[in-house]
Amino acid sequence: MDNVEKFEIQIILLNEFGEFLGKKALVTQEQYQNILNMSKSFYSRGFELTCEDGTFVVFPPEVVNKSILKVKKNN
């Protein structure tokens, strides 16, 4: 049985078009750290997000450059 502690996160993208709430996910501490490390290169390319309601959104680089990325950790 997997005894690795997991917690819930949610990726949120804020820009001139609104607030986009990513689908919540259960991750390990290691996965969370990997997400944070990947977010450091967020502004260098486009971004894809599956939203809470199941909608899949693709943001082009010019929109990403004017956006704020939040990784919310829920305890």
Language model: regions and residue ranges:
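A generic structural signal for short, solvent-exposed coil/turn residues
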Residues: 1-3, 39-41, 51, 61
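N-terminal acidic leader/helix
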Residues: 2-36
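Surface-exposed beta-strand edges and their flanking turn/coil or helix-capping segments
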Residues: 22-26, 35-38, 62-64, 71-74
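A short, charged, amphipathic alpha-helix used as a generic interaction element across diverse proteins
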Residues: 31-48
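Short, mixed-charge low-complexity intrinsically disordered segments
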Residues: 45-75
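Intrinsic-disorder/low-complexity regions
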Residues: 1-2, 14, 64, 73
